[in-house]
């Protein structure tokens, strides 16, 4: 049995995608705890970007060390891949988080969550343009509508406003970067080691964020043990989740994997409630989970039907 056979299994892929979104969901409360522990104010953009940069840079180094140990040699990025992987790190890590951290200061958390969720829908709708095997179907469109309804349900109907337009535009730019990152990642993963791809894109993206954070005057107290432990966990989350996610994108249609991202705000809400004492026992949470689950099922249902007929 080949090592990648389990990654090609649709049931494993669904379980792994849910696991990734669960890990990313833990980032919500841990980032809040990290800001509190390091005493990072809402207006301290430089330190926030530095915090993110160190998180992703450390994650990239973790993945690189794992790669070297597993291959029993130092991994070196081929010259012909340097610009491509740098573009992935710039898009999926650096620009996405810069737009997010700047934009969130000019809009509401509700708008941020709703607009960010559009990354999954943009990927589903655009994937057929870049990948012939990733067809747009009625079920996928229905799945997107159900998923978006679920995001609306958990966040309420605050709506967009001219007062938050600047922030909303920046968050949408972040969303485009996230969707673009998924497309680029899938294209680059073909014929390449997804672990190597993840390691270098996180290192490039994290390093750029770190430099920008320092230039903007960001500072962190590295003697703060609790803060560093939180930062370490966030790095582990990024290292594990991005590595698995990139591998899944290599072997499965982008639309069928990225739709699982809609679970991130659900896990984030539940875990924030458990860890930070926020109220999670709301009807909206249950309705949102049901709608998003139905949306994910709708997007993936064709694949399962084909598996039963032995065609996939």
Predicted regions and their residues:
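Transmembrane alpha-helices of multi-pass small-molecule transport proteins
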Residues: 39-92, 122-126, 146, 177-181, ...
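Glycine-/small-residue-enriched transmembrane alpha-helix faces in small-molecule transporters
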Residues: 1-50, 160-187, 230-231, 311-312
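Hydrophobic transmembrane alpha-helices of multi-pass small-molecule transport proteins
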Residues: 63, 125-126, 136-156, 209, ...
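Specific transmembrane alpha-helical segments of multi-pass solute transporters/efflux pumps
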Residues: 68-112, 153, 234-252
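Helix-helix packing/entry segments at the starts of transmembrane helices
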Residues: 19, 54, 93, 97, ...
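Hydrophobic/small/kink-forming positions within alpha-helical transmembrane segments
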Residues: 25, 29, 57, 89-94, ...
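Juxtamembrane helix-entry segments on the extracytoplasmic side of multipass membrane proteins
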Residues: 9-14, 44-47, 77-83, 156-177, ...
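Hydrophobic/aromatic residues within transmembrane alpha-helices
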Residues: 34, 51, 103, 129-132, ...
């Amino acid at each position: 049995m080949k090592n990648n056979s389990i990654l090609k299994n649709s049931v494993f892929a669904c379980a792994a995608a849910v696991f990734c979104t669960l890990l990313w969901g833990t980032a919500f409360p841990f980032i809040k705890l990290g800001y509190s522990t390091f005493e990072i104010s809402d207006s301290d953009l430089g330190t926030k970007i530095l915090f993110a940069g160190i998180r992703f840079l450390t994650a990239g180094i973790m993945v690189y060390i794992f790669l070297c140990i597993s291959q029993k040699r130092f991994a070196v990025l081929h010259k012909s891949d340097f610009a491509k992987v740098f573009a992935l790190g710039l898009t999926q890590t650096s620009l996405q988080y810069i737009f997010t951290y700047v934009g969130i200061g000019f809009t509401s958390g509700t708008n941020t969550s709703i607009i960010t969720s559009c990354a999954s829908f943009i990927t589903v709708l655009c994937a057929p343009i870049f990948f012939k095997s990733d067809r747009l179907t009625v079920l996928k469109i229905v799945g997107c509508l159900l998923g978006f309804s679920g995001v609306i349900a958990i966040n309420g109907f605050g709506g967009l406003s001219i007062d938050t337009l600047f922030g909303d535009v920046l968050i949408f730019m972040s969303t485009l970067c996230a969707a673009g990152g998924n497309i680029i990642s899938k294209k680059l993963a073909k014929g390449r080691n997804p672990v190597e791809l993840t390691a270098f894109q996180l290192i490039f993206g994290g390093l750029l964020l770190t430099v920008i954070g320092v230039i903007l005057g960001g500072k962190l107290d590295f003697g703060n043990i609790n803060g560093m432990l939180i930062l370490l966990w966030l790095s582990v989350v990024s290292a594990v989740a991005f590595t698995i996610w990139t591998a899944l994108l290599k072997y499965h249609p982008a639309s069928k994997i990225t739709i699982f991202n809609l679970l991130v705000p659900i896990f984030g809400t539940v875990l924030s409630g458990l860890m930070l004492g926020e109220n999670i026992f709301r009807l909206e949470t249950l309705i949102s989970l049901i709608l998003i689950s139905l949306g994910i099922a709708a997007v993936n249902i064709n694949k399962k039907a084909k598996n039963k007929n032995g065609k996939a």
